């Protein structure tokens, strides 16, 4: 509230993929009516200056993480494999405390939340022509662990304080909407601001278990084959099982992948890798059963597990999106051309990657 009232501050807010499938549940509006564009309208009424989509930085994450996986896979005799996804801070913390010898298997790519913060306070500040210290970055997340991640002391690569200043959960945003006496039933749909409001269907499925893997494989295929696969070619990684595995052909090379959600399943998977009964190249793990759609910051329905219902909303949004591939997001392409140069460039490494060994635990 202080930042919203401070005229010297430019308040920028990002909305995570899974939030759009759940924000209306505790406000008494149907999932069909509670579109992300109505949430954008509510946040404008609250007073945010610019409203962006974390799906933009999910696409950016895919470009970095997918490129990193291909580098490791090419050099697999010497590289740390399997490569684990790194966008779930609950999972990263679990590895650090339970399996510290496997931290090097984590992708160094930051999560979409943290990539967004770094880009907002560098590239976007540059586009606005303002000092980065004026940008106050808020994220709306389905996850309580994102508060920990935003506060990790090394997460300030943009050089203007923490890259993400405040994290609000979906439940907290619902309370904010109520506190501002905004009637959700009367909201009209409004568009995200540009250019960090453009995203692909691959970005939106980050909110479902298996979504990060599927999005990464879509772009990895393009990067090695030079052409797009069928957008649904990798949908075998979808499903309700807590631990799923599949193998795919990437331009003649067999890639073995696994997806797990829930830390009990993560533990079983890691133990199987350790004792040699399972062998993978790329593994996605989310701490919450069902992935971010079932995150700890989402609305709670007594006796109901809604993660998979919410995931179906996200897959539906992917299906109707004109963009199905992260590498085709025009705003991501422009961000590389004007600022980052290319995936895994020196600037990309500085702003979009992290060493999880340096994360303090508290």
Where do the protein language model's features map onto the residues?
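Iron-sulfur-associated redox domains of electron-transfer enzymes in respiratory
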Residues: 1-362
